[in-house]
UniProtKB/Swiss-Prot annotation:
GO terms for cellular component: extracellular region. Anticoagulant protein that prevents the activation of factor X (F10). It acts by potently inhibiting the extrinsic tenase complex (ETC) (IC(50)=116.49 nM), a complex composed by active factor VII (F7a), tissue factor (TF) and F10. In addition, it shows weaker activities on other complexes. It weakly inhibits F10 activation by inhibiting the intrinsic tenase complex (IC(50)=4.05 uM), a complex composed by active factor IX (IXa, F9a), its cofactor factor VIII (VIIIa, F8a), and their substrate F10. Expressed by the venom gland. This is Exactin. The keyword Disulfide bond applies.
Amino acid sequence: LECYQKSKVVTCQPEQKFCYSDTTMFFPNHPVYLSGCTFSCTEEGNRRCCTTDKCNR
């Protein structure tokens, strides 16, 4: 999972999408955000695929 950070915004390679998920919860009401760039991101559950880590499509 390789990302590039430009001005506090992480971008991916042109053919990649930034995928983040907030489904992992080790403690109640404390979601752990998992994010990274991937070639194959599937939007299922609470996962979202975006062009940047701010999730603007």
